[in-house]
C-alpha cells in the first residue's frame, strides 16, 4: 500500500489517516508492506503530533512493515530530522552527511529495489552539493543490485501540480550523469502535492508506459487538499 501526506496535528485529525488505510485494507487486506511519501506530521519538532499519530496508527505500524520518507513538514523546526530518525528505523545512506543519512536507505522486495532519498536538506547554499552526494549514493546502490525494477522514493517530485513546487528538477531531471533517466529508474514515488497525478516521462517528454520513468504523486490520506493547477 502506497500513501502520502497524513500531515495532521491531533488524534482527531489523524482519524482521516486511519480511515484511508482501513479503506485500502478492504481492497488489499494482507499487504506485505506499506510505503509513505512523507509529511507524517504538520510540525516535525512537536512531539505531541508524533504521539497523536502513533496513538491512532501505532497498531498499523506494528503490524505492517513500513518505509517512509522525510518530508518538508518533518523538517519544520527540526532541520536535522532528529524526531523523524528517532521514530523510523531507516537502513541509512552513505553521503557524508550523517544527519541526513539516517533519514534514507534502501531495501529489496521481490524483484524490486526501493531507494529512499531526502530532498528536504539544508542549508540552501549546500543543497546542490548534498543532493549530488545523495544521487551518487543512489546510483551506487542501484548499480550493485540485480533486481529488475528500480523504484526511487522522495517527498517532492520534479513534476508538480500545486501551489508549492520544490526546487528538485536540477537534481532529478537535469543532471546528465545522475538523473532518474540516467540511472534507469522505472518508478518514482512522491507526495507533497496532496493531488494524485501520474505520467511516464523520458527526457522531459511524455512517453508510453515502459519507455521511461513513471512518476506517481500520491494524494493525501489526511484532510488537507489543494486545487489542481494544470501545467
What is the role of each PLM region?
Residues 2-4, 33-39, 64-72, 117-118, ...:
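Active-site neighborhood of phospho(di)ester-bond hydrolases with catalytic His/Asp-centered motifs
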Residues 1-47:
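N-terminal active-site segment of His-dependent metallophosphoesterases
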Residues 17-20, 74, 155:
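Extracytoplasmic/periplasmic solute-binding protein
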Residues 15-19, 164-182:
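Short, motif-level signal for alpha-helix interfacial/capping segments enriched in acidic residues
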Residues 1-7, 134-171:
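Mobile, glycine- and charge-enriched loop segments
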Residues 48-146, 166-167, 175-176, 187, ...:
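Extended active-site neighborhood of metal-dependent phosphoesterases/phosphodiesterases
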Residues 7-9, 40-41, 120-124, 157-160:
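A short, flexible beta-alpha/helix-coil linker loop
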Residues 25-26, 143, 181:
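Non-catalytic positions within long, well-ordered alpha-helices that form the structural scaffold/packing
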Amino acid at each position: 500500500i502506497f500513501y502520502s501526506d497524513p500531515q495532521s496535528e491531533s488524534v482527531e485529525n489523524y482519524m482521516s489517516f486511519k480511515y484511508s488505510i482501513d479503506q485500502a485494507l478492504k481492497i488489499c487486506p494482507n499487504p506485505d508492506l506499506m510505503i509513505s511519501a512523507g509529511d507524517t506530521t504538520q510540525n516535525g519538532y512537536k512531539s505531541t503530533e508524533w504521539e497523536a499519530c502513533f496513538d491512532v496508527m501505532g497498531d498499523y505500524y506494528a503490524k505492517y512493515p513500513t518505509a517512509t520518507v522525510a518530508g518538508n513538514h518533518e523538517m519544520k523546526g527540526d532541520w536535522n530530522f532528529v524526531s523523524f530518525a528517532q521514530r523510523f528505523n531507516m537502513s541509512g545512506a552513505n553521503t557524508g552527511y550523517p544527519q541526513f543519512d539516517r533519514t534514507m536507505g534502501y531495501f529489496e522486495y521481490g524483484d524490486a529495489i526501493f531507494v529512499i532519498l531526502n530532498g528536504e536538506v539544508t542549508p540552501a547554499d549546500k543543497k546542490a552539493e548534498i543532493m549530488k552526494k545523495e544521487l551518487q549514493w543512489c546510483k551506487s546502490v542501484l548499480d550493485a543490485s540485480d533486481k529488475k525494477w528500480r523504484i526511487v522514493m522522495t517527498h517532492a517530485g520534479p513534476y508538480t501540480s500545486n501551489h508549492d513546487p520544490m526546487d528538485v528538477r536540477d537534481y532529478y531531471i537535469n543532471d546528465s550523469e545522475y538523473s532518474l533517466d540516467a540511472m534507469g529508474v522505472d518508478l518514482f514515488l512522491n507526495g507533497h502535492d496532496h493531488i494524485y497525478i501520474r505520467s511516464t516521462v523520458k527526457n522531459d517528454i511524455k512517453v508510453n508506459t515502459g519507455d521511461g520513468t513513471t512518476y506517481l504523486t500520491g494524494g493525501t490520506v489526511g484532510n488537507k487538499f489543494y486545487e489542481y493547477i494544470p501545467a
